[in-house]
Amino acid sequence: QIYAAGDLSDPHGTHRTCIEAVLEAMNQIRDEAWIKECRFWLYRGAWQEWDLDMVDMAVPLSPDEVIQKRHAIYRHLSQKDVMPFPGEDKREFWQRAEERTQNTARLYDRLGMAEYQAIEVFVRLRLFN
């Protein structure tokens, strides 16, 4: 499995540049046998969320897992404290990411699904199969 940021509204354009590089690399190895079985998942960062009708995988997060994710974000120095390219929202990345996943959990709750602290959602990108 490969996970990549599908957040193309990143105000600095970093996520778009990264996904283009990953897709080019995938295209170069498209004939390798393992690639046919590989699942490619896109997640969103802090600027927007997938519409629920696009979601292929939803992963519930417990309160402890939300804290673990926050600590993982802290390990990325470019995402910590004041970001060099925050866009219009001046909050720290982890604050926006937590709000995004908590709002997603509320949407699932309103649909009658189980209630969770947060939900991280992914869209599967089908490349070669």
Question: What annotation goes with each model-predicted range?
Answer:
Residues 1-129:
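Metal-dependent de-N-acetylase/amidase catalytic core
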